Amino acid sequence: MKLPIYFDYAATTPVDPRVAQKMMQYMTMDGIFGNPASRSHRYGWQAEEAVDVARSQVADLINADHREIVFTSGATESNNLAIKGVAHFYQKKGKHIITSKTEHKAVLDTCRQLEREGFEVTYLEPGVNGIIPMERLEAAMRDDTILLSLMHVNNEIGVVHDIDAIGELCRSKGIIFHVDAAQSAGKLPIDVQITKVDLMSISGHKMYGPKGIGALYVRRKPRIRLESQMHGGGHERGMRSGTLATHQIVGLGEAAAIAKADMESDNARIHALRDRLWNGIKDIEETYVNGDFEQRYCGNLNVSFNFVEGESLMMALKDLAVSSGSACTSASLEPSYVLRALGLSDEMAHSSIRFSIGRFTTEEEVDYAIGIIQGSIGKLREMSPLWEMFKDGVDLSKVEWVHH
């Protein structure tokens, strides 16, 4: 068993060996290395054909038409293109956008930029379970609302939004619906023929594909228009200029094909491992799951261990590669804004750890993790005066602390 054990699949996944093997055929002189836009020779034709195959593989994953897939550098770019692209194109119709407080920074910061440009954004509060209540969503919709941007699966707490119901609501109100599916594409079944999603962001490295590649699904019927954010040679039907990275696109396509074929068996395994991990630690006193436990992606377990300081817990768990928030904000010592939005205290948010399980996690690794967690929590609490006070029956919420 290799240490540290990787329990951070929500931050990134290793490239599946089958994907890496396929990508190797599209880089060197003895492979297919041509520019897919070169129409005058075989090198270009072969590369273009490889891109077409991959485009169909990504489309098949969500049951879309291959012409609805636009390749990007990843979900961050897809989110930017979707949100800014819609806002700029439809601004004469209205300048109001709805999103939630628990979105990824790639959505929140894009919305903040649009606010600086004169758009109005409503940031919805989730319920205590991390899910946006439908009535709260409907109440925020106005005549000048042009876009709703909402994640399918939350990257920190793994809760799943009902995009079928939300899509129906948006369609009935004439509001464009963008879904950030970075954490769900390739993990949960998605069918855009049934679900009324207009735009969907997809990430390669979250589903065992390479980093630096993603896609944006753009619905053709009813047609969704975007204003391009990247100008140049007019690639990707004018929506995203830039030479297509054949090897990465092939990697994304292969990862999508594998995800579609293995989704059911992968999820059954991951679900069993998640339950094994939770059953091994749930009896530790003052241990709580953050986010809805039922309406949740099975590979995510976000747990707060009360009366344990987050950073010391991370150090105690040095043999486990885990995180205390999203990878994009893990350098910050601030408590997770997602957990704060759920109403957790700073202390509880600070004592939370996200365990994310994936395709290559084993039972042996989960059992090893349980042992380390049980031992570490006990040791850290022995050193905590707060734990001692709590055990003595002191109500810590009523204690007045003196600042020196």
From Swiss-Prot:
Sorted UniProt keywords: 2Fe-2S, Cytoplasm, Iron, Iron-sulfur, Metal-binding, Pyridoxal phosphate, Transferase
InterPro entries, sorted: Aminotrans_V_dom (IPR000192), Aminotrans_V_PyrdxlP_BS (IPR020578), Cys_deSase_IscS (IPR010240), Cysteine_dSase (IPR016454), PyrdxlP-dep_Trfase (IPR015424), PyrdxlP-dep_Trfase_major (IPR015421), PyrdxlP-dep_Trfase_small (IPR015422)
GO molecular function, one term: metal ion binding
Binding site for pyridoxal 5'-phosphate: 75-76, 155, 183, 203-205, 243
Recorded metabolic or biological pathway in which this protein acts: Cofactor biosynthesis; iron-sulfur cluster biosynthesis
EC number, UniProt record: 2.8.1.7
Catalyses which reaction(s): (sulfur carrier)-H + L-cysteine = (sulfur carrier)-SH + L-alanine
Primary subcellular site in the record, as a coarse category: cytoplasm
Pfam families the UniProt entry points to: Aminotran_5
Cofactor field: pyridoxal 5'-phosphate
Subcellular location: Cytoplasm
Active-site feature positions: 328
PTM sites of type N6-(pyridoxal phosphate)lysine: 206
GO biological process, one term: [2Fe-2S] cluster assembly
Chain sites annotated for binding [2Fe-2S] cluster: 328
Domain of life of the source: Bacteria
Record note on quaternary structure: Homodimer. Forms a heterotetramer with IscU, interacts with other sulfur acceptors.
Function: Master enzyme that delivers sulfur to a number of partners involved in Fe-S cluster assembly, tRNA modification or cofactor biosynthesis. Catalyzes the removal of elemental sulfur atoms from cysteine to produce alanine. Functions as a sulfur delivery protein for Fe-S cluster synthesis onto IscU, an Fe-S scaffold assembly protein, as well as other S acceptor proteins.
Family according to the record: Belongs to the class-V pyridoxal-phosphate-dependent aminotransferase family. NifS/IscS subfamily.
Descriptive protein name: Cysteine desulfurase IscS
Protein species of origin: Shewanella amazonensis (strain ATCC BAA-1098 / SB2B)
